[in-house]
Amino acid sequence: MKIVLTADNHLNYYSQKFGAKLAERRGYFGRAWWETIEFAVKNKVDLYLCAGDLFDQVMPRNPPRAKVVEGFRKLKENGIRAFVIGGHHDTPATLSEGATPHNILAKAGLATVFEDVDRFSSEVLEIDGREVCISGMSTDRRLHPGMDPLEGLRIPAEGDFNIALLHYSIVKIVPCGEAEPCIRLSSIEENRDIDIFAMGHYHQRISKKVGSSLVLYPGSTEHNDFGEYKNKTGFWYLEVEGDEVRKEHISTSCQPMNRVYIHTSSLPRDQIMPKLIEEVKKASNPEGLLQLVLKGDLEFEHYSKIDFLKLAMVGNESNFYFEYEDRITPILEGFEHSSSGILEPREELVRLGEAFIEKSQGERDKEIWRRALELALSYYDKAAMEGRR
């Protein structure tokens, strides 16, 4: 039995920061996902499993929907059975939001879609003379942080070989955020008749044995953000013979992505801008995405000479997309921050601003701090007024 397991394809990807380049960025997501279809057909697999977040949104545009229909039709024409669940991005939070975007696949008879979020659905197939049970449950976005989605549930295991599709983090296997529900390891252990847990949600590939069960996360097929720039994108290809599962992680083509960290201690004080521009150009790729992260302490007189506008211009000229993250702590000689008593935010803002103005050397620096204080107070007052409405 041959299987392709994919997840977190995030078709119809959306990020406001790409502006006019969003369509081109989306193209990378679409092409990476399409590689899973072509691989499945070329290798004549028996099963194509999508463990959630095929789409990036509950209501994707028509072009990616049409491409998905084309892909799953290609699978069906080649005798490949497809099974899909919804993930955090493409499962409606409530019934009022409508059906999942995968519903069209079920209606067209192109895939079995397990849409229920609070109970398992299953189907038993005969493959190579064995009964294979595929079960799945879409993500329940109503669950509170810390809740176990499998609590009180038994996963169907009605075959000689059993596979379960889920889209959650599993405690002690992948990081679990404080604001999300997580499957306890004991829930995996209690469902020991499941041979493969085909998982989505975590964007790194994972292969982990829990008792007799194999837990597999394929990771995403394209990088979503700079926090993932080191991840290997792709999907799992599995060959099952008897109780043996041979697995191979197949890489997908992704848009080049890089993140560069520069600490202020490495910056020559008389050549800060030339050094920053040199590092940006060295890390650039005309087709890629680059993030520059600046961190460390820096004397205010040197910090004020960093031309962030020029940095952005050089970065954007040299890359498909560029951004910087300013984590530098400006140090003003003779100023020491201290706090005591009950903090009054607006008063503290004024006190800090006036202190920086007083300690500034030269009228230019003083004017910069005056303007910064005015802007900060205007934003604060606006937010305070909106909060009272």
Model-predicted regions and their roles:
Residues F55, H89-D90, G296-F300:
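Short, internal active-site loops enriched in acidic
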Residues K2, L47, V58-R73, E77-F226, ...:
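His/Asp/Glu-rich metal-coordinating catalytic cores
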Residues M1-K67, G71, E363-E374, M385-R389:
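N-terminal active-site segment of His-dependent metallophosphoesterases
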Residues K21-G27, D56-Q57, C133-G136, C254-Q271:
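Acidic/glycine-enriched edge-of-secondary-structure segments
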Residues G242-R389:
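Accessory, non-catalytic peripheral segments of nucleic-acid enzymes
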Residues A40-K44, D128, P156-E158, A283-P286:
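Glycine-rich phosphate-binding loop signature in dinucleotide/nucleotide-binding domains
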